[in-house]
Amino acid sequence: MDEQALMGLNPNADACYRQRALAYFEQLKASLDGWEVCAEALAKGVYSDDHVKFFCFQVLEHQIKFRHGSLSAAQQQLIRETLMKWLQTQLMNVHPEKPFIRNKAAQVFALTFVMEYLTLWPKFFFDVLALVGLNPNGVDIYLRTLMAIDAEVVDRDILHSPEETRRNTLIKDGMREQCIPALVESWFQILQTYQHTHSELTCQCLEVVGAFVSWIDLNLIANDRFVNLLLSHMSMEELREAACDCLFEIVNKGMDPVDKTKLVESLCQVLQSAGFFNVEQEEDVDFLAKFSRLVNGMGQSLVLSWTKLSKTADEKISAETLRAVESKVPLMLQLLIHEDDDISANIVCFCYDYLHVLKQLPALNEQQKSNVEAIMLAVMSKLKYDDEYNFENEGEDEAMFVEYRKQLKMLLDRLAQVSPELLLEAVHRVFNATMQSWQTLQFMEVEVSIRLLYMLGEALPASHGAHFSGDSAKTSTLQAMMRTLVSCGVSEYQHSSVTLEFFETVVRYDKFFLVEPQHIPAVLMAFLDHRGLRHSSPKVRSRVAYLFSRFIKTLHKHMNAFIEDILSRIQDLLELAPPENGFPALLSSDDQLFMFETAGVLIVNGESPAERKQGLMRGLLSPLMEAFRMLLEKLPLEPDEERQTALADCLSHAVGFASRTSKAFSNKQTVKQCGCSEVYLDCLQTFLPALSCPVQRGALRSAVRSFLHRMIICLEEEVLPFIPAASQHMLKDCEARDLQEFIPLISQITAKFKNQVSPFLQEIFMPLVMSIFEVLSRPAEENDQTAALEKQMLRRSYFSFIQTIASSSSSQVMASQGAENIERVLFTIIQGAVDFPDPVAQKTCFIILSRLVELWGGKDGLVGFPDFIYKHIIPACFMAPLKTTFDLSDAQTVLTLSECSLTLHMIHLKRGPECLQFLQEYLPSLHVSPEITQELCQVLQQPDVKVLKNYMKVFFQQAKL
């Protein structure tokens, strides 16, 4: 072997040696007999270096995986001998190989087994077992090989081809017939021999039993001698977790429901008499987590058996199975309520399934009601935070608790389905008791009682949040709890989790305040003072900003008396935070968006006259405009790029805030009706100069463009005078992304104002198109994926724009561009339909072509256009689908073909027999037979276009064969 290349296998070797090792590896893989050197090295133990041994196994693995079929019988025999010789040397080694080498060897053994067991090496296991006996090094390789075989043949998480699946089924059938009893016997001997002396091997063997039990005869394992051995392992500290996992796999095996019930019951009996059900006496939480998983598996298996049996006529067996399920409930409850959340989480699924069983019963007996109540109390208790939860810096443990809480919420929702009255009553009881003495309780007690009230909102659903109408028992209880919540003073509790839960609950049940509006002032104060928007925690302030906006939106009709008071109290939260003051603002700019929207909602929905609304809106937006002007003056003079970015961000925020206030307007309350047009027009005039700012163009243009989108909706025609100048600036020195984002603005204007904007569109059409052509023609580096994607998106936007123009009543805009320009645009559409393998763009292009044929393809159409139809559009309808990139198995491409068919249909509608005549001359040039040509022409004359669509699909499928 190339010794110098082998030096490069060491992870600490120089890069040049590593490169050489890699090249050598590729060389040996490619060589027909290079692997034999590696086989010899392994068989004779030539190398002591671990990395070289691993390398040799990798080369061997490649041969078996990819070349096995082409090896001669002698070469295949050499592989078998190599593996067995290597295994023999392991038996004599004082120190076993490193685990990574043993794992790789096991993979190679498993691959050889998979390739040869059915044909060349049916005695694989007998040979291996005869060689290794009970030698610990040999047993280790044997067990690792079995796990590697499980991964290759059984593991359901690995995707196999149909051929591999067939092969794997044959292997399992062969093993069941020939060697499984011998393997099971070997496992028993290994477990018995090493249980006291070699815990690692014993655990490995238990893992093998667990892996294989799913597809072998269960009687080989579920018998007295094997189960007693497993149960004895449950009492050994180093083996008990692995034994638990093994029993879990046995219980999980698919089988007849009656047999499954018997198996689980006998197992439970033995576990119970061995004292395992005395959970409170067990201190090892890792074992208990495994035991909880086992009990969960047993419980779910029994529920599944009951579900199957309850559908049969045998009520006696079904009732027995239900009793078996119920007898596990006390143990389930002990595990569910355990202080360790992992132990509790592992039993949740059985608990959930048990509640599902109760939900299906016609009525609950006293014991079942008692069980429901016990589960309810357990869930309520386990929902509590513990002392260690870090609210300021949530890490992995906190994330796990949040997930666990979600599981408990599922249980609570299921409890509500089983017994809504019981849940409501229990929550009411806990809630009232807590609220009466919240001042003296720990935060987790207070938080969970409010949380339970919050969770009722989903557990007892009401359409559109109408929790306070309908069923009087429910509404009066909820109403009473809400009344207590907002009047008992708990919003003053000094813990962020309680504060947040208070506001979340107030907003979830915001419709309560429509029924009892007298509580609104108290809750408003909580939102506005140190409990809410002025809270010491940024996390609380941020969430409250969002919740406050939701609260105001729902209750805006009840806010009239408080509007100006609220606006004055939040005034400092509506200030644009200047980038240079260095002080952290109370709210982030994202939070401020909600505050501006809230202010807008208050002003717009107030009952004051339009004049007052205008005054308030001006008061809200004028400070933004002033700050904007000042910052915009500073920006071009700022030399430091970081400061430039900060200024541009600040300017963008100002525009975003102004834009967000406009969300308050509606069809009932338009900008005009509220007398606010002038204020927003002033904003427009203030913001538009940012478009000509020579620095930070991307950010500023994006912000102003978004504002224009909003103003087109809000100000309607009043915005039109500003569009030409704005467009001119946005088309200057632009990048692909600028254009791509600008086009929807023009499309929006076109679609909304139609003929009104025709003169403007005629003026801007070619400059816009030329800008697009120029950006698309810029050279980009071959591997620059971002640039390629941006160009693709721009191309799509361009075609969408042409589609908007063609589809609207502004189609004259194109017709008036002059023959040369029209031709240029038309060629880009043909190119888009045929040359770019982008079905989204192609589909749009065919829609455009179809529309243009409809507009200009008739007798009074555009001069020269019929000629264009025959020279370019009809050929495009055939050339595009014939491209190799046109994939007819792709749904998006099929839609493109559909539009292509509609284009042909439209041409025939407009040109009649002339079109058919052309096809009869054109199609033979594509090697289409006269019969098929005739057939296509007949289909084209059918009135139902579906026939044509289906025909075209078959036509191109045949053409591509």
Curated annotation (Swiss-Prot):
Keywords: Cytoplasm, Nucleus, RNA-binding, Transport, tRNA-binding. GO terms for biological process: tRNA re-export from nucleus. Its main location: cytoplasm. GO terms for cellular component: cytoplasm; nuclear matrix; nuclear pore. The keyword NADP does not apply. It is found in: Cytoplasm; Nucleus. The keyword Mitochondrion does not apply. Disulfide bonds: none annotated. Pfam families: Exportin-T (PF19282), Xpo1 (PF08389). GO terms for molecular function: small GTPase binding; tRNA binding. Belongs to the exportin family. Mediates the nuclear export of aminoacylated tRNAs. This is Exportin-T. It comes from Danio rerio.
